[in-house]
Amino acid sequence: MVAAARVVSGVKAEGLLRGACAALAAAAALLLGLSTQTETVLLVRKKGTVKDVQALWVLAMAAASAAGYHLLQLLKCLYLGRGGGRALAWTCLLLDKACAYATFATTVAAAQACVVALDGAHALQWTKLCNIYTRFCEQVAGSLVLGMLAAVGTAVLSAASARNVFRHYYCSSHSPPAPPPETCDAH
């Protein structure tokens, strides 16, 4: 009875964290993808968008993909719980790791591109862009924070997936017949 309650609370915690990661990644993608600013520079109107910096565009696509992945995993968690075999547990672990690495790498790459936009690169004669597109840069900074929070949450989820994988092996290594892995249906 206590083990079943633990599993249900673990599934609820995983579902809550997956929902939070999906919301953070979706918010990062939307904030980044929808932010634009038009300014007049030397009598020429210029529009700053996310497509101007390729690292930001890649971050928007990666964050949107991560949000979709977390929604699919949330549905899996709601309908299957912790049920499923070792193959499903390994697949979830590998996909969680890939999502965590991709989200973290694209967020850090976009942050590096934003540092150039913030400070400029004097050796390359690149001017500071955030002096011109202030609101756009603030929105990008907000999306970077949201993307990093989503990456950290995904890393925590990959640790939970690893625990789920090794729990399958722990149950099968004992000599008495172990009960099958718990599912949400056990409550």
From Swiss-Prot:
Cytoplasmic side: 1-14, 76-97, 161-187
Main location: membrane
GO cellular component: plasma membrane
Keywords carried by this UniProt record: Cell membrane, Membrane, Transmembrane, Transmembrane helix
Spans through the membrane: 15-35, 55-75, 98-118, 140-160
Subunit composition and interactions: Homodimer and heterodimers.
Similarity comment: family membership: Belongs to the Casparian strip membrane proteins (CASP) family.
PANTHER family in the cross-refs: CASP-LIKE PROTEIN 2C1-RELATED, CASP-LIKE PROTEIN 4A4
Identification of the protein by name: CASP-like protein 2C1
Species assigned in the record: Zea mays (Maize)
